Each structure stands twice: as C-alpha cells, then as structure tokens.
C-alpha cells in the first residue's frame, strides 16, 4: 500500500496539498454561524444525489409527470425516502442560504477585498431561489401548476416587453408542456451547471482571502 501511495505522492505531491488544506489559519472569533455556507453546500450535494436518483423514474410530460411522482412515492424502492430527503434538504438549503447571507452581511464579509466573493454569493442565492421555483412545478399537481402560472405571469405587468417575456418563460401563451420542459431543463441541467461554475469561483476566493473579521 505504501508503494502505491509513494507512486502517487511522487507525481502529484499529495502531502503538500493535504498540508495546505489542513494548515489553513482559522481566526479565533469563528463560531458555528460561520458554518452556514458549508451546510448550504452539503444540502446542495444531497439535492444533486437525490435529484439524480429521481430522474430514473420521473417523466417530464403533462400527462405522466404527476403519475411518475406517485410511482416514486408508492412503488419505487425507497422512492418515498429519496423524494422526502430531496424536499427536506431543499427547504434546509434555502433556509441556510438566507442565514448565511445575513451572517456575511452583518460581519461585513462583503467589504473590500471580498466584493467579488459577495457578488458570486448573491448570484448563488438567486440560483438557489430559482431551483425552488423550477422544482415546485415538476410534480404537476395543483399547487405546482398555479404557483408556476402566478410566477410566470408576474412579468406581464412590465410595459412593452411583458407579454413576450411571459411567453418566453412559459414557451407558449399558457402554462403547458413547453413550460414543464423548460422548467425541467432549467432545474436538472442549466441551474446545476451555473451553480457549479459559480461555486468554483466562490470557494477559491474564500480560500485565498480568508474568513472576514468579527462583528
């Protein structure tokens, strides 16, 4: 086993990487509230895992979506548990994200030289809210349908571009198959990809600049 480790160590300098990670200075004022961002990340990873599992059974069509969710909850092995964990972790992710934003704001984590860290964090917060909106519509039940109809209808009040914007969001004049397809694509591909990109920007900046000072 040591020979295998030595082989990788010689080429990748694993020990140097491990030392850099474990030897990072942690200020004495850091408390449990500084863990909120990490908890949000953990919830996101749970979302990815449970969401991926449900894609094996979910069918994104207006005729089959609700039935496929019912199948997940009643027929698929541990489907009820996977979907329940997905819903619980979604709520937890939103809550932790809100608390994390408040903690960063109250401790001045948005000030120089951490402006870009704050900007990427705000973008991640918007993406998190977008996950909630798009995911809410996927079961195609009454709550999801009317929620999407209301949310996508809000831009209609904007002069000139309101109606075209609503049609762009829905894919048609009314909420239907095109809307479900759009929201499913956003929820399972576009938003996760954008979230991963901004996380890859967010975390190295935190690593480089360190944790902000006390309140």
UniProtKB/Swiss-Prot annotation:
Topological relation to the membrane, as annotated: Multi-pass membrane protein
Cofactor note: Binds 2 heme b groups non-covalently with two histidine residues as axial ligands. Binds one heme group covalently by a single cysteine link with no axial amino acid ligand. This heme was named heme ci.
Binding residues annotated for heme b 2, in chain numbering: 86, 187
Alphabetical keyword list: Chloroplast, Electron transport, Heme, Iron, Membrane, Metal-binding, Photosynthesis, Plastid, Thylakoid, Transmembrane, Transmembrane helix, Transport
Co-factor(s): heme b; heme c
UniProt keyword Zinc, yes or no: no
Listed GO CC annotations: chloroplast thylakoid membrane
TM stretches of this protein: 32-52, 90-110, 116-136, 186-206
Major site of localization recorded for this protein: plastid
Compartments (UniProt record): Plastid, Chloroplast thylakoid membrane
Family from the record: Belongs to the cytochrome b family. PetB subfamily.
More info: Heme 1 (or BH or b566) is high-potential and absorbs at about 566 nm, and heme 2 (or BL or b562) is low-potential and absorbs at about 562 nm.
Assembly and binders: The 4 large subunits of the cytochrome b6-f complex are cytochrome b6, subunit IV (17 kDa polypeptide, PetD), cytochrome f and the Rieske protein, while the 4 small subunits are PetG, PetL, PetM and PetN. The complex functions as a dimer.
Biological role stated in the UniProt entry: Component of the cytochrome b6-f complex, which mediates electron transfer between photosystem II (PSII) and photosystem I (PSI), cyclic electron flow around PSI, and state transitions.
Protein name: Cytochrome b6
Source organism of the structure: Daucus carota
Phylogenetic lineage: Eukaryota, Viridiplantae, Streptophyta, Embryophyta, Tracheophyta
Gene (UniProt): petB
